[in-house]
A protein has these predicted regions:
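Structural signal for short hydrophobic segments within the conserved structured cores
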Residues: 39, 157-159
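Short, glycine-/small-residue-rich phosphate/pyrophosphate-handling segment
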Residues: 112-157
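N-terminal beta1-alpha1-beta2 submodule of the flavodoxin-like/Rossmannoid cofactor-binding fold
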Residues: 1-113
Length: 159
């Protein structure tokens, strides 16, 4: 029996196009298992407005629309989520953090099954560091690892 084909969603989070991190991710994607599909989304092309946390008010989160919907569907539609995240000031780029902030809303969007649907998907990271001290990337890697753990996602690590 063969396993179902893997579906990789690559979320490009750099503030510049065609940077070193994206180049590394595209090179790595050439070696994905045969039959795997790839979807590449660039947050430059899918800007999100500032996230508003309304959890403790009377308002409720609504179904995503526009760019948020595109990202929501891609996030839930993949088997493997790859965050292509250049190291900015020892952590994630602002656009990557904003994308993850939206997950707080998606956890509460009816029917409220985002956590269950994310469980079992593998979260990966691709990053490039210019510093000789690899510890500079620890906050970035930690953010991804803890995010995966919170949603019961296997963490594939960071290339």
């Amino acid at each position: 029996m063969t396993s179902p084909a893997r579906r990789f969603a690559f979320i490009l989070t750099s503030a510049r196009r065609d940077g070193n991190t994206e180049t590394l991710a595209r090179k790595a994607a050439e070696h994905l298992p045969p039959g795997s599909s790839q979807e590449w989304l660039n947050l430059i092309d899918l800007p999100l407005p500032p996230f508003e946390d309304i959890r403790h008010g009377s308002a409720h989160y609504t179904q995503p629309t526009g760019n948020e919907r595109v990202l929501f569907d891609a996030t839930l539609g993949c088997t493997d989520l790859v965050l292509v995240v250049p190291l900015y000031w020892y952590s994630l780029p602002a656009s990557a953090k904003l994308y993850l902030d939206y997950w707080s809303a998606w956890l509460r969007v009816p029917p409220g099954d985002f956590r269950q649907r994310m469980a079992g998907k593998t979260l990966w990271g691709v990053s490039v560091i210019s510093d000789k001290d690899q510890r500079c990337a620890d906050p970035l890697v930690g953010t991804l690892a803890i995010t995966a753990d919170y949603l019961k996602m296997p963490f594939g690590g960071v290339l």
